Amino acid sequence: ETFYRDETGDDSLFEDEFLRPQIDDYLRFFYWANDKLNLANFGDTPDRIVKHQHVIYYLSYRFDCKKLFDRQDLMSDGPNEYEDFLFYPLVLALKDHGYPDPPLLGICPHTGYAMCRTGYGKNDRFFAIKTGESWNHNHLDAGSFILSDKNMEIAIDSGTCNYGRAEYRGYYTTPQAHNIVLLNGQGPDADMIESGTKFS
């Protein structure tokens, strides 16, 4: 947020009209598989559950949304990192105000994600797709998707790889390492690998 504000002079990232929609976006990313609640994981972040936890705690507290905290709490073992402990005691006191589930179809235009589902229960179908550019991601994975149905994962993204391994540049960042549909055996142009969405 500081980098963005310094580069653009725009300090709106912490205003309610920007942050409140993030609750629905996070709620859309949760899905059931193997009797566990999961968070759709595109890319090479090893543990989305931990990496986003303090953000979910903050949003839950700021907008009094116990539903968001409860879903995160089903996935995690509680606070893990310093930032988590800043908000965890606050979210424990939240009361359930019946925050509605977001619509079954959701598009995040600024990140290029889209999700659709038949519902929010364990046996509902969930589909998410990653499109467009991703700032600082550097994988040729536009079009990769996640699909689950009846509490089972059917298609997931490829997971993580150590940056130091030869396979990282040679294979892992290529379209073939991701579950995307290739056209005539081809995916996104290799020249795009170093370009991401920039602020200026």
Can you name each region flagged by the protein language model?
Residues 140-200:
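Active-site rim segments in enzyme catalytic domains, especially the processed small/beta chain
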Residues 2-155:
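Carbohydrate-active enzyme catalytic cores, enriched for enzymes
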